[in-house]
Amino acid sequence: LRDIAADLGLSEVTVRTRAARLIEDGVLDICGQVDVEKLPGHTLALVAIKLRSPDLVGEGEVFSHLRGVVSVAVLTGRHDLILTVLLNEEFGLLDFYTNEFSKCHDRVSSIETFIVYKGFSLKVPYIL
């Protein structure tokens, strides 16, 4: 925060106070993120889901609690949700579908899976 204060021409105390308020309000989260391409044996999958239910937000919340799910976004278009899923050698795509996604399969009308083979400015929190 010292560097941010210097760049903005503000005191460090001012920046810390503002950052603390943003964190408290849920606007700012300071966390480490990893570049999956630099982690051997890791990959990202994007899982696009068409739901049976019109409760997109409620269903998104359910999917967000599955192991490996980094984030869930509610979409417009032909899919309702897109999940970002972190995978590794011990928890691969088959494990995700067999052990996690299967818990919610009755909520889904169709899915489409995309494997990220190259990302740009793509970093995620390490959750595995």
Explain the meaning of each model-derived region.
Residues 1-128:
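A compositional/biophysical signature of low hydrophobicity enriched in polar/charged and small residues
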